Design a protein with these regions (language model features):
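Catalytic cores of alpha/beta
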Residues: 160-168, 222-234, 291-302
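N-terminal pre-triad scaffold of radical SAM enzymes
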Residues: 46-89, 96-120
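Conserved, mostly hydrophobic/aromatic
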Residues: 24, 51, 80, 178, ...
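Auxiliary Fe-S-binding modules of radical SAM enzymes
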Residues: 1-40, 236-370
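Conserved mixed alpha/beta catalytic, RNA-binding, or beta-rich assembly cores of soluble enzyme
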Residues: 212, 216-217, 226-229, 236
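A general structural detector for well-ordered alpha-helical segments in enzyme core domains, enriched
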Residues: 107, 136-140, 144, 164, ...
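Core AdoMet radical
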Residues: 88-202, 212-219, 241-246
Length: 370
């Protein structure tokens, strides 16, 4: 009987927090951490149901889809322990220089055929500075934008000056992916070649240039639940438009190759908690979902996710886009892509979640997860 009364109290508190979020209020760290610490399956399913209500209220039943292109692979100078593209580790990751226009054109065409709104250019290097590489990057962005098939986005590492951010904006870049990866406290545990503040500085340059931010992190690197909570709060503070939630996929040769996977229900709970803290943002489930969630992949939307990375990741495989589209249909959900978006560059429906700015309105612009 005591256990049943506790469950009822938990359900009531979850409902109270949900109602407050639906009314436009924000929950604080103490309240959020209580959600992250829930462990009983009944409580987690109640939490997911509430997060689903929040998703439907703020995002409807349209799901944003995006994909990425590994535009420069391998040989990265940074020592991020989760990454197979770091030169610090011996992995089987491919290595090649920055791609020319043709692979990006093909990726854009495939994305349009699959109702994918944005294609993100991702490069394995420390970052961008003035020079020939920046010139080439800007050329690729302009070419993709001119074709008008999808919106070009990018995740190109750290930026060392306001001038670089301004040039990306002038080339036509609307969104930039730059994950915080983890909480400030945990960051040095997985990367020591640059700092948490280096990432915040980059985000500041981009925002000053008028570029929208896609920023999230990786769950399952050995961080605590409080670290996950702190990451979500930091993302709320910086005003990220889209929040990709990745789940560690341990790669042979990296320091995390033997990291134990999180239980699927812990992953779904984390997605739900992010929805409570970031109710009106695109919560995007990205890397690691196939290997970590397996048969429970479709439950991410019932846990509050409103966006999905489709197609293969940087160095690992995903399930097919056809399977993802069928998953959406089975759930009564639909992609937010519309044919006229790529042609006209505007959207008449500010509530559709497509991320394209309606006339006289500002919208959050989704981007891929990097």
């Amino acid at each position: 009987m005591t256990k049943q009364r506790v469950d009822v109290r938990n359900r009531d508190r979850i409902q109270d927090l949900c109602d407050r979020v639906l009314d436009g209020a924000s929950i604080d760290k103490e309240e959020a951490l209580w959600l992250f610490e829930l462990e009983e399956q009944a409580d987690i399913t109640d939490l997911m149901a509430a997060a689903n209500r929040i998703r439907q209220h703020f995002k409807g039943n349209r799901i944003h889809l995006c994909s990425i292109v590994n535009a420069k692979a391998g040989g990265c100078s940074e020592n991020c322990k989760f990454c197979s593209q770091s030169s610090a580790y011996q992995t089987q990751s491919p290595k090649y220089g920055f791609v020319d226009a043709e692979p990006l054109r093909q990726a854009s065409e495939e994305a349009k055929e699959n109702q994918v709104t944005a294609v993100g250019l991702v490069a394995a290097w420390k970052g961008l500075r003035e020079g020939p590489i920046l010139d080439e990057v800007c050329d690729r962005i302009r070419e993709m934008a001119a074709e008008g098939k999808v919106r070009p986005d990018a995740s190109l590492g750290l930026i060392d000056s306001q001038e670089v951010a301004n040039r990306l904006k002038d080339a036509g870049l609307e969104c930039y992916g730059h994950n915080l990866e983890s909480s400030r406290r945990f960051f040095p545990e997985h990367c020591t070649t640059h700092s948490f503040d280096d990432r915040l500085k980059t985000i500041g340059f981009l925002q000053k240039a008028g570029i929208k931010i896609c920023s999230g992190g990786i769950i399952g690197m050995g961080e605590s639940r409080e670290d996950r909570c702190d990451l979500a709060l930091e993302l709320r503070a910086i005003g990220a438009s889209v929040v990709p939630v990745n789940f560690l996929n341990p790669i042979d040769g990296t320091p995390y190759e033997n990291m134990e996977a999180l239980p699927p229900m812990e992953i779904l709970k984390t997605v739900a908690c992010f929805r409570f803290l970031l109710p009106d943002k695109e919560i995007m489930v990205a890397g690691g979902r196939t290997i970590n969630l397996r048969d429970l992949q479709s439950m991410i939307f019932m846990a509050g996710a409103s966006a999905l990375m489709v197609g293969n990741y940087l160095t690992t495989l995903n399930q097919s886009v056809d399977q993802d589209l069928q998953m959406l249909r089975d759930l009564g959900l639909s992609p937010d892509w519309k044919p006229e978006l790529a042609e006209e560059g505007s959207c008449a429906d500010s509530s559709c979640g497509c991320g394209v700015t309606p006339k006289n309105e500002e919208a959050s612009l989704p981007i891929g997860s990097f």
